[in-house]
Each structure stands twice: as C-alpha cells, then as structure tokens.
Design a protein with these regions (language model features):
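Canonical P-loop GTPase G-domain recognition
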Residues: 5-18, 150-195
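Conserved G1/Walker A P-loop phosphate-binding module
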Residues: 1-86
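Amphipathic alpha-helical transducer elements in NTP-driven molecular machines
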Residues: 61, 92-96, 100, 124, ...
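Conserved nucleotide-binding/hydrolysis micro-motifs of P-loop NTPases
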Residues: 60, 74, 81-83, 120-122, ...
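Conserved C-terminal guanine-recognition region of P-loop GTPase G domains, centered on the G4
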Residues: 97-171
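Conserved nucleotide-sensing/catalytic segment adjacent to the nucleotide-binding pocket
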Residues: 71-110
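Hydrophobic aliphatic residues
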Residues: 45-49, 103, 167, 192
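Short, glycine/charged-enriched secondary-structure capping and boundary segments
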Residues: 24-25, 45, 89-92, 128-132, ...
Length: 195
C-alpha cells in the first residue's frame, strides 16, 4: 500500500453486512473509546479538516464509516466509539455488538487495526478487552497514544511505558491530532501501512 495520501472520500456508512466488505479493498480500522479524538486523528492523517465530522458531543457516530483512500487503494474505517457513559444501556450494547461483529465476524480484510487511546487516561478495561479481541483474531495492531500535547515529557514516558506494559509490548506511537507536524504524520502513516 502507498503512504502518500492524495485523495480521501467518504464512501458509505454501514450497520451490518454490506457489499463494501467483500470488494477486496484492504481496510485500516480505527477503533477507540468515545472522545479519544478518533475523527480528528483520521482528519489529521488525510490532511483534511472536515473529512470525518468531529463533534463536541462524544458518541455521535453509530455506524461504521468507510473512507476511500487514493481511489480505493485502501479504506480507512471509522468504527463508532465504545464506552460512552451517556448512552442508554441498549444503545451501548448495540454499538459494542456492531464493533465486535465487524472485528470478529464480518470477514472484512483488515490490514491494520489502529487502537486510539487518550494518552492521559491510559489503557482502560475497554481498551484491554479490545487488544485481546484484536489479537485473538490476528489483526495487526498499532496503538496511537493521542492528545500527546497535553502531557510533559516526563508524564509522557511514564504513560507510554504503562500502555506498552498493559498492551504486552504492542507498537505504541505518541501523537497529537491537533499539533502533529508533517513529519510525525508521515511517520505514523508509515507504521500503519507497514506489512
């Protein structure tokens, strides 16, 4: 897969089985709790402010959104955020079922799963569970410790160490969707697109 992102377009949102899953295009799945900056991270990677709608209200996304990168060289797949406290138990359950269906049963050709954490909050139980699911289903994983601009160097290295330990030495990259330079963005894209 190529690393330079020349184009990024919204393809469609799905809530279950769909032909897009079987069209053979490799998928990069972005997963994480509500409010970790998933939409901002994808926007930062494609160098667009508004490809993925960001909202001040976490938990707005309730379907799986597909974005075609470089005319279907791959899809960036934005999964709904999990663990949002203000959702009703029924809504929470249906969102979590949708995420797990996609990761475990949909047979989507997932080339890489990008688990996004709020570096300040570190690894939550939900995130640990997600790491377990991704590993069990052999999805190559990279963890992005987002909102890196919120910590100083000392706090950052302590948090990164704790995240790596909790994730059993997964690849962990610090990042800030709001302040990332071109160089940082390219470095993260390289890791995402590595086989």
């Amino acid at each position: 897969m190529t690393m330079k992102i020349a184009s990024a377009e919204f393809s469609r949102g799905i809530k279950g089985t769909d032909a897009i899953l079987a069209d053979g295009v490799p998928e990069v799945a972005f997963v994480g709790r509500s409010n970790v900056g998933k939409s901002s991270l994808i926007n930062s990677l494609v160098n667009r402010k508004d490809l993925v709608k960001t909202s001040n209200l976490p938990g707005k996304t309730t379907e799986i959104n597909f974005f075609s990168i470089n005319n279907k060289k791959c899809y960036f797949v934005d999964l709904p955020g999990y663990g949002y406290a203000k959702r009703s138990p029924k809504e929470k359950e249906s969102i979590e079922k949708l995420i797990l269906w996609y990761l475990m049963y949909s047979e989507a050709p997932i080339a890489k799963a990008v688990l996004i954490l709020d570096v300040k909050a570190g690894m939550t139980d939900f995130d640990r569970e997600m790491v377990r699911v991704l590993r069990e289903h052999d999805h190559p994983l990279v963890i992005v410790a987002n909102k890196a601009d919120k910590l100083n160097q000392k706090e950052m290295s302590a948090q990164l160490r704790a995240i790596k330990e909790a994730a059993h030495e997964a690849v962990v990259v610090q990042y800030s969707a709001t302040t990332a330079t071109h160089k940082e963005r390219d470095a993260l894209l390289r890791i995402i697109f590595e086989d």
